[in-house]
Amino acid sequence: MTAGRAVRVWVDITNSPHAVIFRPLIARLEARGHEVTVTAREYAQTLGLLERFGIPHLTVGAHGGGGIAGKARAAGGRTAALARLARRERFDLAVAHGSTDQPPAARLAGIPQVTMFDYEFATAMHHWNGRWASGVLVPDAIPEEALARYGMRPPKLRRYPGLKEEYYLADHRPDPGLAAELGLSPSAVVAVLRPPPEVTLYHRGIANDLFAATLDQISQAQVEAQVVVLPRTAEQRAALQGRPVIVPERPVDGPSLIEAADLVVSAGGTMNREAAALGVPAYTPFAGRLGAVDRRLIEEGRLRRLERPEDVELAPRERGARPGMRDPELILDAILDVANGATR
């Protein structure tokens, strides 16, 4: 790809956080004159967020559920469908964050593909994507030697400084109507909780009763508090019925909710890192192996490891200026540079 030439970029979005990640990047790509096509998988709040953000997209496939066989069937069918689409559309570049469907589909269609991630221990995903991707983009907290076993080495591997959240949140403006939509009280301590992703492969076999205990602890606290829970699945939503919590009826803009909150407890990674980037106290009850990004945040005091429900400090947070953000153009340049110098 020649610098300055308009290209056709294909973005694949397979999970709710990816809609937030790519929202500003898509806008900036289009502002540069590039044409962007978005494909999406039906899973969690992915499609709802894309609709809320006004991002046109093609829905291709759905999540395969919690079983390995179901995941394999869904992935095979979706990869084949994406490869057919890519051949027909003749994209110049493909990019995704954590998609295991796009890398092989792009390779089959002869399109350079950039894969992004920020958790190095999703071994099945990385062995797979490391084989198919043309380029890999990760935070510099992850050492090169941790990725070599996946076939991810320079020049295929490119690392960027800081958190990805510090880039894509640079343009973010909070939704002014969100507090009223959810019925949040300005006098209450607002806690946002995100349950563990029970169907995710790297959580398989790991129990997280700590999350449920923490939810009970906060709900029963002797202070004026409101708890907003963002379930990942219909089963999680059903399990929350009857509890004294707020469960949004439709997908919400996560960063806007975080900025309205006093603290965040998330068993996944993205919401905690968004909180860290926005200066909001964040706790992780993640029961698996912590990745390098979260370890760095804990060392810096920007993320706290939750070991007991009592560890949560339920108090109003200090509100002031946002922490410093980073220039999203650097991420766009890195994506295009990885594609330009891709080793196939």
Region spans (language model):
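Conserved nucleotide-sugar phosphate-binding/catalytic loop shared by glycosyltransferases and other
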Residues: 30-75
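A donor-sugar binding/catalytic signature common to diverse glycosyltransferases
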Residues: 94-105, 115-116, 257-294
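Donor nucleotide-activated moiety binding/catalytic core segment of transferases
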Residues: 78-85, 234-271
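Catalytic donor nucleotide-activated moiety binding site of glycosyltransferases and closely related
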Residues: 53-66, 215-248
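A conserved, positively charged/aromatic
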Residues: 114-116, 126-138, 258
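A nucleotide-sugar donor-handling region in carbohydrate enzymes
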Residues: 137-206
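Catalytic binding pocket for nucleotide-activated donors in carbohydrate/polymer assembly enzymes
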Residues: 277-320
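C-terminal amphipathic helix plus adjacent low-complexity
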Residues: 5, 318-344
